[in-house]
Amino acid sequence: TNGDNDTFPLWYCQETEGVRTDARVCNLSYLQTDWYIDQMKRPAYDSPAVPIHWSRLEYVAGTREGTSVRPGTLEQVMDYYKDDPETLKQMVGDNPYELKNIIDHWVLNPNPDLRIIPTDSIVVTIDKDAVRRSGMMMAGDSIPDVMHISLKGKRAVYKSEMMMYEMLAQCNWERPLYVAITVGKDNYGNLGNYFVREGLADRITPFNTKESGKTVDTDKMYDNLMNRFRFGGLDNPNFYLDETVSRMCYTHRRLFAQLATQLMAEGKKDQAHKL
């Protein structure tokens, strides 16, 4: 999540109503701070800790607030690989483009001068068996070997985004990561091309859904909207709709319209009509 209006109601549901205490709500606005990262690294309710493996000294306030993106550095690195590949692999890992290597060997480097991202084109190597076990929709003809994250045009990656990348690097598709649909594109961490909508949240997948066009998991979204979500109160003429609540209602209407359109495109007309 990103703002108060899409976060506090979820905290209420978990804290007071005991709903989905196995899931972890993470507010990206707070993820720039060390005290909130501390909380994310601890279990809460029935949820295990968020997969952030940094030590506190590595993210304490004033440290790694922003990591410069310097794509020109990669040319030098590749030249070093040609000259002395074994030594360089020990220093910066097997693949200079790989997200986990970049975090471990560059971003977390003890030398402040080397705490950079040496490329604007990052890859995440995909564990295909883990993807098959994950239960996510296969949003492509085949599972890709790698996932590409483009940082073109970015001058720096700030701490909250870096924490998102750390979660992605560590989770290995065994724990699903979602972004609320109310989060603005500026906070996607350049991962928007890999989202699959399942309801009020988009699941991060290894599939480039912008290329495949498979951006909606109609089975999960239909089940959520028709069976799992609870709606009520709007038929009460005395119910006050303020600006914020009105926007939320419009968001839900758009969800139904989007799902109906996709169901029709997939030939599932009966389900579309039930919406």
Q: Which positions does each model-derived feature cover?
A:
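ER/secretory pathway lumenal C-terminal domains and tails of membrane proteins involved
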Residues: 2, 6-275
